[in-house]
Amino acid sequence: MNTPEHMTAVVQRYVAALNAGDLDGIVALFADDATVEDPVGSEPRSGTAAIREFYANSLKLPLAVELTQEVRAVANEAAFAFTVSFEYQGRKTVVAPIDHFRFNGAGKVVSMRALFGEKNIHAGA
């Protein structure tokens, strides 16, 4: 079983890689057979190639990502609240999701689900 410290460190690396636009760093956190459902209710992306494509599209704009609460990590699962800020066509937007990671025995993310909806998307200042 993964320790809370390991899972928290993975979340911190994920946030840092998003901020740096580090596609390889993000993809390296996931198992080869992982799934990403972002947002929840959308078609899950499965496998390294699909996950790479998803994050490559996500990183087309510079992102400012910040954890807003402590990471909750227990029993091979972690959840974390954060904000993602970006500017598109002169308009700043802030999204406030909660992501849920599930880990395999090797410490890799096997499932990522992003929970957010319209009420969690705001015009930035």
Curated annotation (Swiss-Prot):
Its EC number is 5.3.3.1. Substrate binds at residue 99. Keywords: Isomerase, Lipid metabolism, Steroid metabolism. GO terms for molecular function: steroid Delta-isomerase activity. The keyword rRNA-binding does not apply. The active site is at 14 (proton donor), 38 (proton acceptor). The keyword Metal-binding does not apply. It catalyses: a 3-oxo-Delta(5)-steroid = a 3-oxo-Delta(4)-steroid. Pfam families: SnoaL_2. Induction: By steroids. GO terms for biological process: steroid metabolic process. It is an enzyme of class 5 (isomerase). Homodimer. This is Steroid Delta-isomerase. It comes from Comamonas testosteroni. The gene is ksi.
